[in-house]
Swiss-Prot record:
This is Gamma-glutamyl phosphate reductase. It comes from Burkholderia lata (strain ATCC 17760 / DSM 23089 / LMG 22485 / NCIMB 9086 / R18194 / 383). GO terms for cellular component: cytoplasm. HAMAP family: ProA. Its EC number is 1.2.1.41. It is found in: Cytoplasm.
Length: 423
């Protein structure tokens, strides 16, 4: 296969389809989503058979159990796909909305209309559910998409792509609006991320090595995040019961997510009261604690252990594991300085009852999501009321934070006149 020619053809067809998608009605888009949902219900066994072949090959390669679990399309996973499609269909369609319409002294009206981005390339690892999630969000937001999943899920993704194509056709929409890259050749990714004439944005969903490669090689703009080094700062004016709840949930609710707390900062004025019960809670949940000297003193005196001395590297680390770095700081200024220096601009939280300090934290912490008295785990499209998300961005341009339907659109200016000419 000539990868360069193959990817160019996908891009050309996607660009053509994107024009039809931009003018597609809400009814047609919702009909396509419903048709795909019904096709998955109808062909569940076909999908599971294709997926079983992917799973068998993954096991033959010796891939670990967690990887195989993410790859597997169980009945529950298929039901979740169907529910997700119908949920996206129920969301309000942002395309065509005109906002901020106002009269100018010249007599014209000026506003902004929400429009699709165009063609979105999505690169992800071996999670077949992303094929449906991404296709649904791109479809509802009026975009065409080129999906490049992990090679280990190729048969699963190909089977899903067939059903997506059927759904689009049934609704009178172009099948090329959603295309799955049907090759495991890594050169396909290299071509996709440089096709500026056909692809408007890349959304990568994967590990750090993938994101780093794309940062170095992509010519197409990206919506991405590299790390989730999330912090919780417990102020000396915190409610300790709230602090225990927030710190427990932020770390132990799920270890492997990008919005999990990786560093806990505790004000020196409250460390002696908070750290002993919190340390025992983490110990009971088998969380490894990597602590600075001040935190070690308090925790050791309370009989909490074992403890590991934190190094400079720990403040830079996204563990994605039951490991937590703890540092005692002098107060709010030191906490904000630490977060802005070591953080990844993803999600950070303060626990405090002081309104002025909370507002300072919200203003001065340079992150996509900043929280007061709430777990960092809430940094999620569903929890934010976006209905669904295609990913989380810690960049500052275009989309920032959880990226839902609106994040896959842009605004263009519209002018309504009555024959006016500029004086």
């Amino acid at each position: 296969m000539d990868i360069d020619q193959y990817m160019t053809d996908l891009g050309r067809r996607a660009r053509h389809a994107s024009r039809a998608m931009a003018r597609a009605s809400t009814a047609a888009k919702n009909a396509a989503l419903d048709a795909v949902a019904r096709a998955i219900e109808r062909d569940a066994q076909v999908l599971k058979d294709a997926n079983a072949r992917d799973v068998a090959r993954a096991r033959e390669k010796g891939l670990d159990a967690a990887f195989v679990d993410r790859l597997t399309l169980s009945d529950k996973a298929l039901n979740t796909m169907v529910e997700g499609l119908r949920q996206v269909a129920s969301l309000a369609d942002p395309i065509g909305e005109i906002s901020n319409l106002k009269y100018r002294p010249s007599g014209i009206q000026v506003g902004q209309m929400r429009v699709p981005l165009g063609v979105i390339g999505i690169i992800y690892e071996s999670r077949p559910n992303v094929t449906i999630d991404a296709a649904a969000l791109c479809l509802k937001s009026g975009n065409a998409t080129i999906l490049r999943g992990g090679s280990e899920a190729l048969e699963s993704n190909t089977a899903l792509a067939k059903l997506i194509g059927e759904g689009l056709e049934a609704a009178g929409l172009p099948q090329d609006a959603v295309q799955v890259v049907a090759t495991a050749d890594r050169a396909a990714v290299g071509k996709l991320i440089t096709m500026t004439e056909y692809v408007d944005v890349i959304v990568p969903r994967g590990g750090k090595s993938l994101i780093e490669r794309l940062i170095n090689e992509a010519r197409v703009p990206m919506i991405k995040h590299l790390d989730g080094i999330c912090h919780v700062y417990v102020d000396d004016r915190a409610d300790l019961a709230k602090a225990l709840t927030v710190c427990d949930n932020a770390k132990t609710h799920r270890y492997g997510t990008c919005n999990t707390m990786e560093t806990l900062l505790v004000s020196s004025g409250v460390a002696a009261k908070l750290l002993p019960p919190l340390g025992k809670l983490y110990r009971d949940k088998q969380v490894e604690l990597r602590v600075d000297a001040a935190a070690r003193t308090v925790l050791a005196d309370a009989g909490v252990g074992p403890l590991v001395d934190a190094t400079e590297e720990d403040w830079h680390t996204e563990y994605l594991a039951p490991v937590l770095a703890i540092k005692v700081v002098d107060g709010l200024d030191a906490a904000i300085e630490h977060i802005n220096h070591y953080g990844s601009h993803h999600t950070d939280a303060i626990v405090t009852e002081d309104h002025d300090r909370a507002m300072r934290f919200l203003r001065e912490v340079d992150s996509a999501s900043v929280m007061v008295n709430a777990s960092t785990r809430f940094a999620d499209g569903f929890e934010f009321g976006l209905g669904a998300e295609i990913g989380i961005s810690n960049d500052k341009l275009h989309a920032r934070g959880p990226v839902g339907l609106e994040g896959l659109t842009s605004l263009k200016y519209v002018v309504l006149g009555h024959g006016e000419g500029r004086q």
